[in-house]
Amino acid sequence: MTYSQVLASIQSTSWPDFAVFYIFLGGAMTCLGLSSTFHTVSCHSEKVCADWNRCDYIGIVTLIVGSFFPMIYYGFYCAPLLQAIYLGMISLFGGATIVVAVASHFRSPEFRWFRTGLFIAMGLSAIFPIAHALIIYGWRLCFDVISLNHMLLMGSLYISGALIYGARVPERWFPGKFDIWGSSHQIFHIFVVGAALVHYYGVTKTMAYWHAQNHSCQKEIELMVPS
């Protein structure tokens, strides 16, 4: 089921539903757009390569932050204060990550694992809102209210891709064999696209669940039925 199909099937959606989805979608498009531009122009000159490499890092952060928005919005659908706290947390974390990632000092090859670890840590900060949601709703209901299974799969894909990229596998084992196809960077991008698609599907399921079960926030959590 696509996002458009979900919107067409329910009447209770409002502007925040559109906003959080398009923030996520915009983050994904920004990430992939900046990355593809970087790879296209990186051979132009050292300066152009360095400038667009910074844009590439900014795109990664934008995707991570954008992915948080629908998860936090629906995870705390009836708790605006918690929404604000966690959205503020990831936004500040994202801003700090951009400042560090684009600094000239940290762009050198010897800081590759530092940058990789920074992006992984940023993604793993989702543990805090997810743990909070588990306390509020319980394990079973979280598969619906935040689409926990999709969240876990998405996180696994992002982390796996980042580790492959950081380890430079498989080209480190077979130098010169993956210069055109099959390099770690290409594998990383495949994992990123897969994770974004998984999250897209999870967001549509979560939105459909909330609007079917408790869109007005008048039902007690104990009365919400797992799908």
What kind of region is each of these model predictions?
Residues 1-227:
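Multi-pass alpha-helical transmembrane bundles in non-GPCR membrane proteins
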